């Protein structure tokens, strides 16, 4: 890469008054991984941009084609438990029928996989449906709980083995009722009274243990001024919860977020990632002829199916009551299949999981309310939900002042053969640090999840650990997904 291409960008950044910062305001990164999924680390960008990545289809993960599942199955959770992937979802063949009609019976179903790609249904023999127990249902006939039961793997230190799995489900009438399990299949009610009340809860309500905040966090459904909203509450013991607080979204427009699907990101658990369903009531996309061709009026007793649409968006949080919506555009679009332009199609499952050495997956419902209803797997590069992107014309990114612990800096990055990345350390005032300047850096021209940055003197940066510094990146035809300081 020609360094002269960067001179103008470098001078503009260095001369900008906003690069001056107080050392006491430094971000304390320690040795953790940071994703470029928001502007948390970024102070200035010139000739580069923060871009949302688009997932690729990994094919069908599961078809909802069993008698106890069907066209309105939903509220899917995928958990990675060691080398086993566990999937939970509501099974319900049809809607719009009486509670005593088997077509409207709701059950909680369980499937599993060893690779996160192909899921199978174990015959568990726990629940009778249609005169047989040969099915994968684990809960049934418990009021509103099986409408939206959402388990999680409790990672709190010291949690009893008998409560390694927890889950909640319910409605505004019942509150959120908690269940526990040792094996993720046999669930028992934790207590008779609900653990959380005061919400609408008529969606998927997600709980997890946050190492970052040292508490359980629950994100649940409420309404605010007629808009489907997300509210949060916390607890240190899972029994006693703080007064709920509505989440804020900064300057983002108020949109119906039907599900939040929020959990701690598995490679950087201080970052919460939500793959939310964005619902557009009364926004009809299908013409009358298209409705007729899809036979939607015959598919299910649900008139709204043809009148509404939905897609998926990205939410992030670093704790507290604020969601960041850096990217307002869709994370997942309905696509060219007309069957996905119906109400409640394109609802993501909760859970982003590792499905390969350089791949992670999310899952999304397709063809909701129709006989072809299925769950699709979508893949990202590991850490690759978003990236700082430079085109062929070089650009720069400057971080805020930070401190770190460690002796090496690694980047999750990708470049073309023509492109690459250079890295410079600066002091808090923006002055390049001798030995770690751009001129000293060995160009990173590669595609790697953890490429170590080196300078003429080597890769050891331990002399800078604990000191307030900035990182300056020069980039050409490259993407920067994440960085990590390694001890």
Describe the residue ranges of each PLM region.
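Intrinsic low-complexity/disordered segments
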Residues: 2, 19-21
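Bacterial N-terminal signal peptides
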Residues: 9-18
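N-terminal export leaders
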Residues: 3-7
């Amino acid at each position: 890469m020609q360094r002269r291409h960067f001179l103008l960008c470098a001078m503009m950044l260095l001369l900008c008054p906003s690069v001056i910062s107080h050392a006491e305001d430094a971000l304390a990164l320690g040795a953790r991984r940071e994703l470029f999924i928001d502007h948390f680390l970024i102070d200035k960008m010139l000739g580069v941009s923060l871009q949302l990545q688009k997932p690729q289809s990994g094919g069908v993960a599961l078809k909802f084609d069993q008698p106890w599942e069907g066209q309105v199955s939903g509220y899917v959770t995928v958990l990675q438990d060691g080398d086993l992937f566990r999937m939970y979802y509501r099974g319900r063949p049809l809607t719009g029928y009486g509670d005593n009609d088997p077509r409207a019976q709701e059950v909680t179903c369980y499937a599993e996989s060893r690779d996160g790609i192909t899921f199978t249904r174990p015959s568990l023999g726990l629940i009778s449906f249609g005169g047989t127990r040969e099915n994968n249902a684990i809960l049934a006939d418990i009021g509103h709980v099986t409408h939206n039961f959402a388990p999680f793997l409790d990672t709190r230190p010291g949690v009893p083995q008998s409560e390694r799995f927890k889950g909640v489900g319910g409605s505004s009438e019942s509150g959120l009722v908690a269940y526990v399990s040792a094996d993720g299949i046999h669930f028992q009610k934790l207590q008779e009274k609900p653990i959380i009340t005061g919400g609408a809860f008529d969606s998927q309500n997600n709980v997890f243990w946050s190492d970052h905040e040292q508490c359980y966090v629950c994100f649940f459904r409420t309404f605010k001024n007629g808009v489907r909203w997300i509210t949060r509450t916390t607890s240190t013991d899972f029994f006693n919860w703080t007064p709920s607080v509505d989440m804020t979204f900064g300057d983002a427009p108020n949109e119906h977020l039907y599900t939040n699907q929020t959990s701690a990101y598995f490679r950087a658990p201080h970052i919460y990632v939500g793959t939310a369903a964005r619902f557009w009531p009364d926004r009809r996309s299908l013409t009358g002829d298209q409705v007729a061709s899809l036979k939607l009026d015959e598919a299910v007793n649900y008139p709204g199916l043809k009148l509404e649409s939905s897609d998926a968006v990205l939410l992030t949080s670093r704790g507290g009551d604020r969601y960041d919506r850096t990217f307002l555009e869709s994370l997942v679009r309905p696509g060219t299949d007309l069957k996905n332009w119906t109400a409640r199609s394109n609802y993501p499952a909760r859970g982003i999981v590792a499905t390969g050495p350089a791949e992670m997956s999310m899952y999304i419902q397709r063809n909701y309310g129709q006989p072809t209803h299925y769950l699709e797997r979508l893949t990202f590069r590991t850490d690759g939900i978003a990236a700082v992107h430079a085109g062929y014309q070089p650009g720069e990114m400057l971080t805020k002042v930070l401190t770190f612990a460690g002796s090496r800096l690694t980047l999750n990055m990708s470049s073309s053969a023509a492109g690459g990345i250079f890295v410079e350390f600066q002091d808090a005032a923006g002055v390049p640090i001798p030995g770690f300047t751009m001129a000293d850096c060995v160009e990173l021209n590669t595609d790697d999840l953890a490429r170590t940055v080196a300078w003429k003197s080597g890769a050891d940066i331990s002399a800078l650990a604990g000191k307030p510094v900035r990182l300056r990146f020069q980039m050409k035809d490259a993407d920067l997904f994440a960085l990590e300081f390694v001890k």
